[in-house]
Amino acid sequence: MFRSVSLSSLIPFLIIVSIAMQRPENDVPMIMQSSWLVNEVIKSINSNGQYINALIKKDFQPTVLPVSFILRILKFTATTDSKDITAVLADSTHKIFAIFLFFPAIVDFENKYHHRMTYNTRSCLIRIHKANLKFMDKSTVKKCYGRKSDGGLAIAVLEVLEFDIFFKDQYSFINSIENRLKYVYDDVEYNQLCGKKKHKPEYEDLMCDI
């Protein structure tokens, strides 16, 4: 059974979906989402100039009310040798790489919903209850997400520990709309901040099966 959602809980971040052709060219039709991801990632990284390990922020979450930690699953990209699942998630304007840990995130999810995490969840909205933000080594980023190294750019990844389905319907849009979603890594401020990092955190090198 999926969790029921009251109308009052949707109002703060509800954006009505309509036919793409009826929207202005730069208006991306998203539901129940806000644009907050890139600002929170940059804020978290900027709060500490040096890192002795890969962890950027424990218990990463939106800090501006009434934004809720709701993201859309765009795609699953790989499974690691530890049975973690890598994916791309998005708010209303930006995308980020994510990794769902097998334990506790995937185990708890599959025990709750009685089906595999990847079953009919692509393009669904999820509410993340607990997650960390951490840097991932470039070789793992290439293996698990297919992104080539951008020089010295450090890649921040969302490590999901606890989540559930927020809205079970699957929402995807034509390519011209989906392509308007930008990676947080392509943001100018992110590049200025993470492209010149002098720290060398210890990374965990993961093996991924595409």
UniProtKB/Swiss-Prot annotation:
Keywords attached to this entry: Chromosome, Nucleus, Telomere
Superkingdom of origin organism: Eukaryota
Disulfide bond sites: none
GO molecular function annotations of the record: telomeric DNA binding
Cellular compartment(s): Nucleus; Chromosome, Telomere
GO process terms (BP): telomere formation via telomerase; telomere maintenance via telomerase
InterPro entries, sorted: TPP1/Est3
GO CC terms in record: chromosome, telomeric region; telomerase holoenzyme complex
Protein's job: Component of the telomerase complex involved in telomere replication. Stimulates RNA/DNA heteroduplex unwinding which favors the telomere replication by the telomerase.
Family: Belongs to the EST3 family.
Oligomer status and interactors: Component of the telomerase complex.
Name by which UniProt lists this protein: Telomere replication protein EST3
Annotated organism of origin: Candida albicans (strain SC5314 / ATCC MYA-2876)
Lineage of the organism: Eukaryota, Fungi, Dikarya, Ascomycota, Saccharomycotina
